[in-house]
Amino acid sequence: MSTQLVKIGTWGGNGGGRVDLSVLPRSLKSVTIRSGAAIDAIAFTYIGTDGKEHLAGPWGGGGGNPTTITLGSQEFVKGISGTFTNVVTNLKIVTNVTTYNFGQGGGTAFSLPLQSGSVVGFFGRAGALVDSIGVYVHI
């Protein structure tokens, strides 16, 4: 079965600088989020289309508390949701096992539940905080 990689999003503001991947993702291994009142930063490890492990980020600032999600061998991200103002204020990462919740929220809601496929990477805009976020999805 062949898969297709698509970019979906972004949700958030226009501040900060553009952040994206130089090697396209094939699978997501772990995600580290720094958060407090908002999403301060995101970093993640992934296996690229070149077959190698890559680290993206951290994108954003050094505030907030860091939390790392290490995906299990059979765990995958089946959706994201959250809220934003001019920055991302809340991010929920939904896997086939559990839901991880970051930031305090407020603003406009967004949601991307996937009926099939999985989130394999992120892109967006970042400066002192994560200004906007989008996802790479294998469908």
UniProtKB/Swiss-Prot annotation:
GO molecular-function terms, A-Z: carbohydrate binding
Free-text tissue specificity from the UniProt record: Expressed mainly in roots.
Stored Pfam families: Jacalin
Ranges of residues in domain Jacalin-type lectin: 5-139
InterPro entries per the UniProt record, alphabetical: Jacalin-like_lectin_dom (IPR001229), Jacalin-like_lectin_dom_plant (IPR033734), Jacalin-like_lectin_dom_sf (IPR036404)
UniProt xrefs under PROSITE patterns: JACALIN_LECTIN (PS51752)
Keywords: Lectin
Top-level taxon of the source organism: Eukaryota
Stated name of the protein: Protein GOS9
Origin species: Oryza sativa subsp. indica (Rice)
